[in-house]
């Protein structure tokens, strides 16, 4: 990480910094990110961004993320995180946000341009995530318009789909799951620590062409299984009866902590569903998905409140998965878009 440097932008009172990463700074960033998410109803920063920042704090990494801030005294007015490319073949990822009180003044645009300049000639290797437009019929939010204004064009669309839960839906999901049986050679079980390496192998194979999921490392896995939301009883694995290390398929659920109460919260998430390429074509994905849905239908948050909804994310071009989730009652709630410099979708 670069040493702290400061310059005062000519048109604002904000100070731009790229501070050395510390635990105190990460706490400040988390507070900023939570406040933005509370205001906007969607997080501007992905789970992977938070994980990469934590990893960089805990251990020395060859390609640490870069965190740029626009500060007003002790207040973070805007933040820009660049996840550095790990190889010549990979691209980097940018996520950024402006605090609500500082929007509409041009401060975000000036800061974004400054941060991109700090990336130098490598800036063209980065793609920008913009989270949470209302639907997929156009660019509806200032953030999406902002991306376009700065020469970025959409190259990937990710749907957040939601299934509200009521008693009828809960019963239906449980009945559907009970009606599905695994092949005779497989058994359903839940995750244990002994599954780390077998799971990583199957995950990499199942998501060989996925830009994020297929690249999960042991450190990434342990970061997630060590988090406060992880529940092994919600991580389902279909494996050979005679060989637990032979994983045919899996589905992982997530119930985030500290969600509060609302019409659709607390919510649980179908975090990831994967099928070993050697086992594809037999309906295992649907069977494991239904098992996870039945689990979430009867689950509660950390305070004992039953879940009000189930969420999941799916790429817009994954028509098979989209059709499956639509058939199960899910509908698109918001849309995330990834942008690249000078490209069109």
What function would you assign to each model-found segment?
Residues 18-19, 30-136, 248-267:
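Conserved donor-binding loop and adjoining core beta-sheet/short helix segment
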Residues 199, 245-251, 259-267, 279-283, ...:
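Extended hydrophobic-aromatic, low-complexity segments
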Residues 145-170, 290-294, 303-345:
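Active-site/acyl-donor-binding loops of N-acyltransferases
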Residues 1-10, 87-88, 100-184, 339-341:
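Acyl-donor-binding surface of acyltransferase catalytic domains
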Residues 2-56, 175-214:
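Short amphipathic alpha-helix that is part of the acyltransferase structural core
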């Amino acid at each position: 990480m670069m040493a702290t440097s400061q310059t005062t932008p000519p048109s604002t009172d904000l100070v731009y910094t790229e501070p050395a990463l510390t635990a105190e700074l990460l706490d400040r960033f988390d507070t900023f990110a939570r406040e933005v998410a509370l205001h906007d109803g969607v997080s501007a920063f992905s789970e992977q961004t938070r994980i990469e920042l934590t990893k960089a704090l805990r251990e020395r990494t060859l390609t640490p993320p870069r965190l740029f801030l626009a500060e007003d005294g002790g207040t973070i007015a805007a933040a820009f995180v660049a996840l550095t490319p790990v190889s010549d073949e990979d691209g980097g990822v940018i996520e950024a946000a402006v605090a609500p009180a500082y929007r509409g003044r041009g401060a975000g645009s000036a800061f974004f341009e400054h941060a991109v300049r700090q990336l130098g000639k490598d800036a063209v290797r980065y793609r920008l995530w913009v989270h949470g437009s209302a639907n997929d019929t156009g660019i509806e939010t200032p953030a999406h318009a902002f991306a376009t204004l700065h020469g970025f064009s959409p190259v990937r669309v990710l749907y957040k789909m939601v299934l509200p839960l009521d008693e009828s839906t809960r019963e239906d999901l449980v009945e559907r799951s009970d009606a599905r049986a695994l092949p005779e050679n497989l058994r359903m079980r839940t995750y244990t620590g002994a599954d780390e390496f077998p799971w990583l192998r199957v995950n990499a194979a199942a998501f060989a062409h996925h830009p994020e999921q297929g690249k999960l490392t042991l450190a990434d896995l342990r970061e997630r299984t060590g988090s406060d939301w992880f529940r092994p009883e919600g991580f389902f694995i279909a494996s050979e009866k005679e060989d637990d290390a032979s994983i045919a398929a899996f589905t992982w659920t997530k119930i985030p902590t500290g969600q509060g109460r609302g019409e659709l919260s607390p919510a649980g998430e179908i975090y990831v569903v994967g099928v070993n390429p050697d086992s594809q074509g037999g309906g295992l994905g649907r069977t494991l998905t239904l098992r996870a849905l039945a689990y979430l239908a009867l689950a509660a948050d950390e305070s004992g409140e039953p879940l009000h909804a189930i969420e999941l994310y799916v790429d817009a071009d994954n028509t098979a998965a989209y059709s499956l989730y639509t058939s199960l009652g899910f509908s698109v709630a918001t849309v995330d878009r990834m942008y690249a410099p000078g490209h069109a979708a």
